[in-house]
Amino acid sequence: KEGKKQMNQLKPMLLTSLKNYNRSQFVKDVTAGIIVAIIALPLSIALALASGVGPEAGIFTAIVAGFVISALGGSSVQIAGPTAAFATIVAGIVAKNGMDGLIIATILAGVFLILMGLCHFGSLIKFIPYTITTGFTSGIAVTIVIGQLKDFFGISYPDGVKPIETTEKLKAFFENFSTFSLDALIVGGVSLAILILAPYVLKKVPGSLPAVIVGILMVKFLPLKVATIGNLYTISNSLPTLHIPSMNLSMIGDALPNAFTIAVLAAIESLLSCVVADGMINGKHRSDMELVAQGAGNIASALFGGIPATGAIARTAANIKNGGRTPIAGMVHSITLVIVLVVLMPFAGMIPMPTIAAILFVVAYNMCQWRTFVHLIRTAPKSDIIVLLTTFILTVVFDLVVAIEIGMVLACLLFIKRMSEETHVDSWTYVDDDTPDVDEHLRRLPLQIRVYEITGPLFFGAADAIEHIVVKDFTTCLILRMRSVPALDSTALNALQNLTKVCESKGITLVFSHVNEQPMKVMVKSGFVDLVGKENFCPNIRAALDHAEKIIATAK
């Protein structure tokens, strides 16, 4: 039954959606697909430019990856394509390793994603802390804004100055700020105003479309000297073609860290988008199949001139709001973009760079989650705030690879510290006949019996709690009550073995009370139960105390 459930997780949602498909839903899917394509067009171009590649690469990604991920995906409504989350990391890879380096890293990331899906890792993404995803998402938003300041203000850099890192871009921006263009600022400001106001005026039309149109008209008919996409890139309306890069072991080795980061980021973004979509349509996605589809989509995108892709929350939400309910909508979105590529791509060269920067400013604002960021700073535990700020700062100052790696390690260490603080060992209060005002329910114990109650998980971070157990010379029997110990690892087991040796050297019998299932399995498998003696493991404290009293009686 479990195996059948896992196999169902690897079934494309398209096959399920087509079972009860009808003409009415087809019309809705086609309409939604066309609308989403209109939204995706300027975004794909802008995100491609932010990623340091040509504008057509963004369209290729939305076409190829978008189609494959919709056809094979585990979500009925997911729309995939280039996203802002990848912009800075892709730009860094292209600057350092060129397009072939990016293609290799993306293909490897696709392989990782497929393996993650086949190994049923879809549910494991939930173990990545919310503070890390919020931290690096906010960090990416800041890096996007910093990266677009140059084009928004029309600043010119001296020949040979091509900053790659975010800090280098910020330094170059301020050093050359005197070269800013008022014309660029006017176009960028108007575009930004349209992007902000359009949602309130044009309910059904994405703000990026009128912003692009107005930007083109301003540059075309007003005496404004502003750089356009056509000034910086060669525009082509040819369809994507297959390109397999030459690669060797050295190139593959260099690409592995970036590939891992792309894979993890794609998994997080896509599954987060699926969860949001599930809430909007009251559905249930198949996380493992979605990862496989993301992998296949990224491999296809890389081979056909695209960049890394993942599920896009904004485009997915637009698909749902416009009636899309099956993967057909995502496939129509890709087909529509093919038509747009052939017919309208030459006009893309007329789009002003300040307009592209304005679009990316809004994208960055929408993804930065600043309200969540501030809320966490105000209300989260100190350890979570440390992880949040560390991940955010490392994303901005260094890159996403460093941020995720150090963020995860730091989160794990702080979690271990927190869990170790929850584990404690308490000695039972010793009472005798001379102790006044003793509660009737307390059991008076012989002096020779000592009871310690352990609370919390016994693992390597809390193993030293065993050292708090004090063995008196007059003790004949030591009882460890473990009803509140849910887990035990080998480090803590080693500490218990050392305690056993101390007890043996002093002639003390060690008795265990109420050992839970997981700790008992560890003890049995390691031979610890045989070492202590099966008779010294009791189901509850009453049985353990009775057993201890028999041991004392026998010793007399």
Outline where the language-model segments fall.
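Active-site-adjacent beta-strand anchor residues
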Residues: 80, 512-513, 538
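Generic hydrophobic alpha-helical segments
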Residues: 90, 170-173, 466, 470, ...
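Short secondary-structure boundary/hinge segments and terminal tails
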Residues: 296, 337, 521, 540-541
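The feature marks cytosolic C-terminal regulatory regions of anion transporters and related permeases
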Residues: 366-531, 549-555
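Short acidic-hydrophobic, aromatic-tinged amphipathic segments that line or gate anion-handling sites
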Residues: 531-547
